[in-house]
Amino acid sequence: MDQDPRKDNPVEMDVDRDDSSQDPDDNESFKSALDEPLDLKELYQDALEKPSEEPSEELNDQVSTPAALTARAYQLEMFEASLKQNIIVALFSDRVMVADGHWQWQDSGRIWFLTPTVALARQQHRVLQSQIPSVKAIMLCGQDGVDSWSEQAVWDAVLLNVRIVVSTYQILFDANAHSFVRLDSLSLIVIDEAHNCSGSHPIARLMTEAYLPAKKAGLPVPSILGLTASPLKSNNLADIEKLEQVLDAVCRTPTIHREELLAHVNRPEMLVVSYGDSGTDPTPTDLMTRFLEAYHRLDISKDPDVLLLKAQRTERAREKLRQMITKKDTLAQKELRGVYNRALLVRREIGPWAADYYLTRTVSHMLAELERGEPPAQHRYIGEALRSIPIPAISKEPIQLSPKVQTLLKVLASHQQDPVGIVFVKERVMVSIVTHIISTHPLTKDRYRTASMIGTASVPGKARNHMDMTKKEDMTSLEGFRLGRFNLLVATSVLEEGIDVPICNLVICFDEPSNIKSFIQRRGRAREVSSTLYLMVQNASSESATDWHNLERLMKERYEDEMRQNAELELLDDPRIGSYPVLEVESTGARMTIRDARSHLNHFCAKVSSRSRYLQKEPYFVIRQVNPDPASPGRRTLLQATVHLPASLAPDLRRHESLWTWTSEKLAIMDASFQAYKALYNAGLVNENLLPTKVSDFLADLGDDPGHIWVKTQFDPWPEVAYAWQESSSLYSRRLTVLVPGVENPLEFEFILPVPVPYMAPLKLWWNATSALTLITSPEMQEFRKQEGTSAGPDHSYALLAMAFAHRFPIQGRQYPIRLVSTRRKLDVDGIAALEFDPRLYESSPQPPLVRLVDGRNMPYFVTKILPSKPPVELISKPSTDHADLPENVPYVVCKPIGKAVGQFIPLDAAQDQDSWTPKNGKLYRKVLPSTQIRMDNFPAVFAQVGAVIPAFTRAVEMSLVAADLMYNRLGCLQLDNLPLITTALISSGSRGPTNYERLEFIGDTILKFCACLTASALFPNHHERLLSQWKDKLVNNVRLCRASRDFGLDEYIINSAASKKWRPKFVEDYMDEMKSPISAETRQMSSKMVADVVESLIGAAYMCGGMSKALECVALLLPTPKSSQFKWQEIELSRTQLFEFAPKDAILSKQLEPLEKAMDYTFNKKSLLIEAMTHPSCAGLGTNESCYERLEFLGDAILDVIVVKRLMAETGPNELAHNDMHEHLSSVVTADIMAFLAMEWVIMQTDINEIDPTNLDALGLLPSSQSRITPASLVSNKEDWPFWRFMRHNSPQVGATQTATIERYLTLRDEIRDAIWKHNTLPWALLARMGPQKFYSDIVESLIGAVWVDSGSWKACEDVLTQMGLLPLLDHLLETKAHVMHPNVELQILAPPNKRATRTEFVIISNKRGIISSGTEFLDEPSAVDDGLVSVEPYDDTPEHDEVFSCKLFVGGKQVADVTGAATKEEARVRAAEKGCLVIKAERKVWNEAKAAAKEDKGHNTENGDANADNGQSGEKEEVPDCRDADGDTVMN
């Protein structure tokens, strides 16, 4: 605990002080106040302050600019008392000043301010911020999502540097119970409205369960400061002592400065106003009668709630149905009944006009709600009843008002002062009506600016009443009241307690206060001098209303009666509840009592339940009676509860019983909930904070993806090579064969390095757009020793470089890191331009040399043709500037230069290709040179070609050396043997290298996902599918892969930069000079995804090298997990065996599933796996010990991906698929729509059925009954197909109804879908969307694959099942026909990226029944059928209304590009619009590209003319290309 300035030893002080050590004078002085002339209420309940400064005349000035609060003497007295011990300050609003003194005085520790309501918390936070701006204060409430803060790191981040926290009671209790906020981290707890802290109140429990035990144990605890207007809820002083014991504090009120306190107390004048008899006829109005008749006409048998329970056909559903019908307890019944009862109340209290006004507004509001959006079935059912009610026109002005309301209006009209007041109304429904009357009635509308307030509280988990017309604008109204926009507030009891409102001079109690506390709180609102409190009663002559003293006394008696009744009820509570065990976690201090268990269990079930929409997710309790204890008094019936948890959990965790027997259902349910939660904790599904387990409890959350990060610069192998050239005594050599297009005999070189020469895959170095040199290194490597004192043999690298580059920059005679030695002829720089030009050589030699322009630079050219004389300048594309001066009658050569871009790893484009020039516009020759200005090399031109590609070859060698260093050092333990594969795994596409890692990354991603899913499933057999999905996401997400890559040191091996266009050779001497300089740690910026991708590409490379086991070794090496995570990568077969052992033994296959096993041509070793694979969560629920398919589906999804990816990777040679094509095919064939269609197509068996002959009128019953008969001859034998999907076991009427509707759509669309796939070689996404299958169709496909693999461990067995099902044949067909498989939504995102303004897409979906129902950018990242759970996409089974059809407009960049109509579902409308939009965009883009190409060609023609005209002083005119940009300058669909 932080140092408390009140004493030098605060801990010792707190430990020593207990209940017995309290100063007896403290209590005595408090009690003595009761005996003095001033009544206790006047002392601490009516202490109503004036501002220390004179109030401003303008209300706005009073409330909008908070003045600095100045403490008065009696406030300082309370403050000083609070510094000595824990106290409960008994004042009204001045008590906040006492608390304010604490945080201005304390210099350490965190202070927690507690309030009963969010509104009061917001008010206190605002005051603290304005009065102490130097201290960071925050407010926490449920709207901040506090209930989802389930990690210590979140709480630590929120509370970082926070000195003051303001919250409601429950938030601190929960945070402490889960050990997120420990008591020793607080220096002070301030409890506003402290009189509430009794019984099971959260703060009473915090004190008794945590504070007092910690203090007794000698642990540091915070100080306590209670604030209240009235610690006394009755005239029993024992209540004060109880409150003091609970809060470990003593009650204090001013005794020394009491006179000053009284000077600031303004007691309002109280007037009792009688309104007499109600004076209104209680007979319902005509509209009320019609409403009641509509209610009685409702057929409860057609109520959606009833229909739902009838269809379930379970014991639980039947019992619930019986109670629902008996009590008329459906949602529709309750809502309509509530409306009518509220109308009766309004009729009685206000009058007939008000009742009709309320009903008219309510019915109109509900019908309007039904017209908007997509209401649930219950509200459509209500709407049918409401539409039958004729709504009359009613007067806008209030008429026929009750005497009670008329009295209220007269009181308001007669108030003398400038009114600032509150009207307190008991019922919520009355608030808005009374507000409307005051605002519109002639007596009051001009004088009162009226608003209403009913409170912001809501019941968690309770459905909102759609027919509740009460407004939720409370904070706006309250703020307007504070700022003076309103001068009258009509409110419920929400304004009684705590909330700060302006000083009022008028308070009216429209209804009698319910208890003494309510009366005192209302009276305290009238704090202005000469203020008035009006108490409206039916009969002013009653004894209770003679004067306010009698009224107060009567209310005390009533309140005491309530307390006595409550006390009697509490006596019925089982006293053993206090001795029930507590679940406490020693490591964190988190604890849970039996009182908390049910809320904890509900929260757990909501978090972990199956995402299926067909299941109830809350726990279900069954109560049973047990024999009463004969020895117990009265032999009361004892009860025990059994709780059943969702089917997502393992069978042994789904059923739990209460530990003890109880006398009430509530306590038995609490007991069962506690036992269930304890079992979940023991099973590891609840963490150390007693919250549902998350993977972040084991693996730390690494935060968000940063996008780009700084990593080490790429490893450079050349300094090591240079050093070896100087120091090593060994050399290494491989044979390098160069295949040159057009040259019959390949060239051969010795490729020599002073380090082991890496083996490289055949390397293509492109010479132009269509041809490339191919360099092949031999598999065999030779090692030999350098002879001491020699240069280690010939080196032709220098000559090769000089042939190609000496004309561009000087090639110095130094040692190049790579040594190439021709095996067939000697190469020397002296042979460059060594011979006179001889035209005969070009006619006879198959490999002629280069010619060079003798101009000092020896510019090299290839000779394409020899002319006998100088051609006219008009025939030359690029004539020399001195062409006219050149000799006429000498041979000329037509030539072309060596391109600067030759030797790239990818084909050259037209602009780079020197060979792509063709004669045009009458220009026959590109370049000509006279024979008098040229010389020839002394060796064929092909050697210069080899020299020209040395830069690219050097780059490829560098990549291999980088990969070799990684493979043989950091990855050495894996014993990988394919260096070219590892090299590929390190090269990004941005490097423009010979290969890139994208294909390997694709398969590595799939393998990693499989390993993660398998290992998590095996290690955590109790973890449900949602938790397993968290494991998978945590293990394979890019942030973790990026971190692992950097930790392992992969970042310096990633090759991501392209070669420089301004290449210059770097020699051994250069590297040696650099090594003499200090080495600095250089970094580079890189995409975090690229850093993560290399991990996956290496996993893919390991798989290609050694299969799944080698891949798993690589995964374990690159992605280690801490021991604390409880996760450890393990062998594939070990994990599979564990999963196999988890499956129940000796399960007997039902007759229903036997045909499926037989049709699969696979016999399960454990039948339970097939049963589990075909069991929907609705069938694995109450009363069964079976598991549902969710875990197997989770694993089967990963297995299916592996099988498909292996098939895609098998496409090699000319059929090899690019990374994008592989991704599109995988995404297409494993999408839920496709698998669902295949599940309907896969016929498992056929059964014989007999049907009535449709031509037999007799058998059809179309003849008179006396003549009608069915005979064997009347029947026709047929075969009925039993497709795969029919073998799914479920126990849900909704699932059955969905299957029926889906199969009808399937039968209608089947032929079209098959034709599109097998005849037109395309995937019909729109038709599949029209079919709209639910996700469970694809789930059983994946779960079946998972079951076969777990049972057999055979990939082939799984492939055989997929072949029978048709999935692999479909994939083969798509590959063979090169079908277009991309989903339209994905294609549209590529053609029109939604993140660019000019191509931003928007779908507008329109219903012929409901108008526009959705608008915005809506895509599916991966096309799939809709999950039958909590998903963000539109549900296919969201049943349209009768004859409802949909249309969709698609806008791209604000321009409409598609408009489709007649769609059966919203998803079909969206997909069809995307398809049409893609066609339109591609057509527009084609036109634009053609125009662009034509403009470019015209521009080239004018440029050539311009070159010719330049000699004449003219310039070529520039051709303008059409501007295809929008107003913002963005390119449109370019």
From Swiss-Prot:
Coiled coil: none annotated. Residues 597-700 form the Dicer dsRNA-binding fold domain. One of its GO terms (biological process) is regulation of defense response to virus. Induction: By double-stranded RNA (dsRNA). Keywords: Antiviral defense, Antiviral protein, ATP-binding, Helicase, Hydrolase, Magnesium, Manganese, Metal-binding, Nucleotide-binding, Repeat, RNA-binding. Residues 1-10, 1492-1504, 1516-1528 have a biased composition (Basic and acidic residues). ATP binds at residues 78-85. Residues 1505-1515 have a biased composition (Polar residues). The record marks 1335 as: Important for activity. Residues 1-36, 1492-1534 are annotated as: Disordered. A motif (DEAH box) lies at residues 192-195. Residues 404-575 form the Helicase C-terminal domain. Residues 65-249 form the Helicase ATP-binding domain. PROSITE patterns: DEAH_ATP_HELICASE, DICER_DSRBF, DS_RBD, HELICASE_ATP_BIND_1, HELICASE_CTER, RNASE_3_1, RNASE_3_2. Mg(2+) binds at residues 1193, 1339, 1342. SUPFAM superfamilies: P-loop containing nucleoside triphosphate hydrolases, RNase III domain-like. It is an enzyme of class 3 (hydrolase). Its EC number is 3.1.26.-, 3.6.4.-. One of its GO terms (molecular function) is helicase activity. Residues 1383-1483 form the DRBM domain. GO terms for cellular component: cytoplasm; nucleus. Residues 959-1107, 1153-1353 form the RNase III domain. SMART domains: DEXDc (SM00487), HELICc (SM00490), RIBOc (SM00535). Belongs to the helicase family. Dicer subfamily. Dicer-like endonuclease involved in cleaving double-stranded RNA in the RNA interference (RNAi) pathway. Produces 21 to 25 bp dsRNAs (siRNAs) which target the selective destruction of homologous RNAs leading to sequence-specific suppression of gene expression, called post-transcriptional gene silencing (PTGS). Part of a broad host defense response against viral infection and transposons. Controls the expression of the non-LTR retrotransposon Tad in the African strain, Adiomopoume. This is Dicer-like protein 2. The lineage of its organism: Eukaryota, Fungi, Dikarya, Ascomycota, Pezizomycotina. The gene is dcl-2.
